[in-house]
Amino acid sequence: MIKSKDYLVDYNVELALKKEGLTKADYIEICNRLKRSPNRTELGMFGVMWSEHCCYRNSRSLLSNFPTTGKNILVGPGENAGVVDLGEGQRLAFKIESHNHPSAIEPFQGAATGVGGILRDIFTMGARPIALLNSLRFGPLDTPINVGLLEGVVSGIAHYGNCVGVPTVGGEVAFDKSYSGNPLVNAMALGIMETKEIVCSGAKGIDFPVIYVGSTTGRDGMGGASFASSELTQASIDDRPAVQVGDPFLEKGLIEGCLEAFKTGYVVAAQDMGAAGLTCSCSEMAAKGGVGIELDLDLVPAREKNMTAYEFLLSESQERMLFVVEPGKEELIMNKFRKWGLQAKVVGKVLEENIVRVIHEKQIVVNLPADSLAEDTPVNKHELLEEPPGFIKDHWKWDETSLPKVSIKGVHFKENNTILDWNQIILRLLDDPTIASKRWIYNQYDYQVQNNTIIAPGIGDAALIRLREIENQNQNSNRGIAAVVDCPNRWVALDPERGAIAAVAEASRNISCVGAKPLAVTDNLNFSSPEDPIGYWQLAKACKGLSKACVVLETPVTGGNVSLYNETALPNGLKQPIQPTPVVGMIGLIQDINSATRQGWKDQGDQIYLLGTSIDPSILNNQNISLAATSYLENIYGLKTGRPPLIDLEFEKLVQLFLRESIANNLIKSAHDISDGGLVIGLAESCISSGLGIECNLPEIDNRLDKLLFAEGGSRVLVSVSPNNIHNIKNSLNNFNIANSEQISFNYLGTVTDNKYFQININQTKIIDLSVNEITNKFERSIPRRINSTIVS
């Protein structure tokens, strides 16, 4: 370490660096910048601000390649949330963020405060929150620990969202052993702008007052940002001070107080206190505004006695915000919050010099360059593997010829001379918790509060929310916002680039399946340690795939979150990384919600078609669709292997365009994309959603029948069409294909029936014959059965 007398400190540097998650190189860099050593409080501030959670030091160079501009983009990355222009004077703020590590330690509060934090990102921009979604990952539901994590997380999300009065309208949940002990909790929020001007976070106005509003500051959440930037270990279980405690009723008042304050026009800048608390809010506001901030901790409302400057600055107590307001308007603004029972005090002022100066007990305890804390932060350089890791190459060598033979009867297992018939296989897939109904989860959420939810969870491929006029909430509007979260983590684990492409493509396809036009993306990159060459390779390749897909599908990235070090220390000293999980949150706009389509069949006699990639045997034999990386492969053979198919993005774009045009023209009555589980599971899900049966006749195939039934990939959508519209839609597609020099297929599959049976024939031979009641029971009972049996055992 530095030995000059000018750099003497009154603390053990090595122990302090370990606690703050900093390296010796970081410490030397800090000293060089300051021309002195930092005191212990200042070192803590650098620890949180230079963590991956706050400054993206391992991922920033990769994120810079994302497309971030477009004709509808008003605010991109760098602010609390992205904002898009919806036309007709309406603007939407939206963002996704993670709360993974806190949820692993304290699932209820970790998930609840994750919801509270993402809501603050939205209303800090001047938007009223209108919807929540979540993307969750857990280990298998065969251990009390994983069941407890699921129950705690879902209860926390439900508690906060329900109490604050914002509907949780959609999401996705998947299960894999890699998430055991390290669940993923990603929360997404949407809000409609209520203010004329978008409220930004950059401070300005020398000597303008800085106002603290919201809850009091306590010792909860100490060092949460640093905690979120390291792996989970056994010691983390005792790190409960790093988990915050939220109050949704207080947040409800904060929403109203903020929107009222913003509408006065006297708020110059606003920043919520999330990760790193006061440290992050004041340093980011100063750095973004090119000014400084002086903060007097003696004026900050405290929840506990004898708090140190370190504790004040690193506390992550919830429901707090920092404002810069015009001089002379302090009381006017503060009264907006006091009437809601909230704290509101002037705690500082804007400085001309670009520094963060903190006073505690009448002494200056912090004097740091704002840019060094929040803008000019370190970037870790990693060598990118030139070739895929060896185990990935081995997976890519797999092909379908290694599987047992199949026939009309089912799969023939030679080793024990048994046949698993197609009915049994379908029921097994529908019982997979990742595929099965999530009703046990979403029934705990209030998804109808605010009375704007048009498509609720479990009904359509994306959530759909009515856009009401801000000035007149009683006036109906025909326009709506579609929203979805997606990530095929099994695909990403086997090919991060192709898996990330598929995540964007599927999210966009889901938006299109309800009739909405995809507009923009917010992403949540959940990965393991970037210091592991494989972990960094996965992150880099996934970012490349996301960028490619967003460019082609014209869905710019407006911001998001990076969550690294998602791995669990095992008793044997090894580490268990999660499957790489780049979650894509996407929003879209529909002009007429009355034309929106759901996934369930509508009427007996409607005809069922497969739109997009053909089921022609010649297509089945190419790389567009495959049994590699499928749910079928994992559930029936216990294999997670193969190389996922590559989505043809240009073809995908055209399929979605034709789908949306057909929905808008009322040519299609239902739409459901084919993804997890393949064609037959997609058909089954539409039967379950509607309660109606089907009789389908699929083409005979020379090679593998299971590929026809369960392959994944391609750009494929199941649609149902009234017999009266068959000629019109075929004629429309023919003209579309000619105009675009493309061959989008439209394969007839069968008919919707009212006999309540799920029947599929091959060359007039019935291979699948199940009652809709039977497949529904299997689908609906999967998660509750596992939870109940694990609790009992």
From Swiss-Prot:
Binding positions (Mg(2+) 1): E97, N561
UniProt gene name: purL
EC number: 6.3.5.3
Stated role: Part of the phosphoribosylformylglycinamidine synthase complex involved in the purines biosynthetic pathway. Catalyzes the ATP-dependent conversion of formylglycinamide ribonucleotide (FGAR) and glutamine to yield formylglycinamidine ribonucleotide (FGAM) and glutamate. The FGAM synthase complex is composed of three subunits. PurQ produces an ammonia molecule by converting glutamine to glutamate. PurL transfers the ammonia molecule to FGAR to form FGAM in an ATP-dependent manner.
Keyword hit for ATP-binding: yes
Catalytic residues identified in the record: H53, H99 (proton acceptor)
HAMAP family: PurL_2
Top-level taxon of origin: Bacteria
Binding locations of substrate: S98, H99, N100, H101, R120, Q244, E316, S317, Q318, S563
Quaternary structure, from the entry: Monomer. Part of the FGAM synthase complex composed of 1 PurL, 1 PurQ and 2 PurS subunits.
Residues reported in the UniProt entry to bind ATP: Y56, K95, D523, G560
Places the protein is found: Cytoplasm
InterPro entries: PRibForGlyAmidine_synth_PurL, PurL_linker, PurM-like_C_dom, PurM-like_C_sf, PurM-like_N, PurM-like_N_sf
Keywords assigned by UniProt, alphabetized: ATP-binding, Cytoplasm, Ligase, Magnesium, Metal-binding, Nucleotide-binding, Purine biosynthesis
Catalytic reaction list: N(2)-formyl-N(1)-(5-phospho-beta-D-ribosyl)glycinamide + L-glutamine + ATP + H2O = 2-formamido-N(1)-(5-O-phospho-beta-D-ribosyl)acetamidine + L-glutamate + ADP + phosphate + H(+)
Coiled coil location: none
Matches recorded under PANTHER family: PHOSPHORIBOSYLFORMYLGLYCINAMIDINE SYNTHASE SUBUNIT PURL (PTHR43555:SF1)
Annotated positions binding Mg(2+) 2: D121, D272
Functional pathway: Purine metabolism; IMP biosynthesis via de novo pathway; 5-amino-1-(5-phospho-D-ribosyl)imidazole from N(2)-formyl-N(1)-(5-phospho-D-ribosyl)glycinamide: step 1/2
Name of the protein this chain belongs to: Phosphoribosylformylglycinamidine synthase subunit PurL
GO terms classed as biological process: 'de novo' IMP biosynthetic process
Gene Ontology cellular component list: cytoplasm
Family: Belongs to the FGAMS family.
Keyword flag Ion transport: no
A molecular function (GO) term: magnesium ion binding
